[in-house]
A protein has these predicted regions:
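Active-site glycine-rich loops that stabilize anionic/oxyanionic intermediates
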Residues: 46-50, 261
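A conserved short beta-strand
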Residues: 144-155
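Conserved alpha/beta-hydrolase "acid-adjacent" motif
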Residues: 207-212, 266-267
């Protein structure tokens, strides 16, 4: 089984993927053992990161080799945002059929066509601005995704401009619970079944307050009709995992608040099941969000 050591520059530049109204770049990683009708994970990097740096830190391509997963890495251009952040708070980049979400949708369509992806097994994850853009994709193109994982992110449409975004990141204000539900439902005509949701956040995150994690959970609790306290709480790698199950007993939402962790993606680089490398915003805390997210989605079985 692979360890945390991964080679650099593992990704392949994606040359063509539609009209690209959001003016994004894209990279892919298709493992040699990728099967026909295999799954696809869309991975969205955070601010000041690149597709390659996030892949290296998170270890997604190592897990892809292990489990036969195709990866798509949308990448922001500095001409769009000087910090390389996805523009999740701009109205033109948070609507179906427009801007960055449409670019990402076009990338997905191209990868599905090029590599015979199973359209029922497409997933999306991201950290920080990539986590917030994950919320955007889950709301604006819900028919595309079987699951989403939001790391150190924010709820869909919690902010509509940069000033609001900065305030929300600090944990202040934001839509009511009723409005959080309505924002997702108004983003498309989709009526379900909805993606399962995995939420990860540092308990000591001073960049994006972990109140946002709870808001994300509440947004999707209403969509999945699982309001109220978690169905159960269990311990995984020493951290509490809260789980909400629907009426059929399916786990539809999980939440991890990693005590003592700051802003970033939780990784476990060492050991037989280690993935990734510690770096800025890639935080060694003894639990691999990458591996556990993939397991939640049924990709490690």
């Amino acid at each position: 089984m692979p360890t945390s050591s991964v080679s650099h520059d593992r990704l392949t530049d994606m040359k063509q993927f539609g009209t690209d109204p959001g003016s994004l770049h894209a990279d892919t990683y298709i493992p040699k053992n990728f099967p026909k009708n295999g799954p696809l994970v869309v991975v969205l990097h955070g601010s000041t990161q690149s597709a390659e740096s996030y892949n290296r830190g998170s270890g997604w391509s190592s897990l892809a080799d292990e489990c036969g997963i195709a990866l798509l890495y949308p990448e922001q251009r500095k001409t769009n945002n000087p910090l390389s952040s996805f523009n999740w708070f701009k109205s033109g980049d948070s609507r179906r059929g427009d801007g960055e979400p449409l670019s990402i949708r076009q990338m997905i369509e191209q990868v599905v066509d090029d590599h015979a992806i199973d359209p029922s097994r497409i997933f999306v994850t991201g950290m920080s601005s990539g986590g917030a853009m994950t919320s955007v994709m889950l709301a604006t193109y819900p028919e595309v995704f079987a699951g989403g994982a939001i790391i150190a992110g924010l709820p869909y449409r919690s902010a509509d401009n940069l000033i609001e975004a900065m305030v929300r990141m600090k944990g202040y204000g934001g839509p009511s619970d009723h409005r959080l539900d309505a924002l997702v439902r108004e983003a498309s005509t989709f009526e379900g079944p909805w993606a399962t949701i995995s939420v990860w956040h540092g308990g000591s995150d001073s960049t994006v307050d972990n109140a946002n994690a709870d808001s994300i959970v509440r947004q999707w609790q209403q969509i999945h009709k699982v309001e109220g306290p978690p169905t159960r709480v269990e311990e995984l790698d020493g951290f509490p995992r809260q789980i909400w199950c629907n009426a059929g007993g399916q786990e539809v939402i999980e939440e991890y608040i990693i005590k003592g962790m700051g802003h970033g993606t939780p990784i476990m680089a060492g050991g037989d099941e280690g993935l990734g490398e510690a770096d800025k915003y890639m935080l060694e805390v003894g639990i691999s969000s990458t591996r556990h997210i993939a397991h939640f989605w049924g990709l490690t079985e």
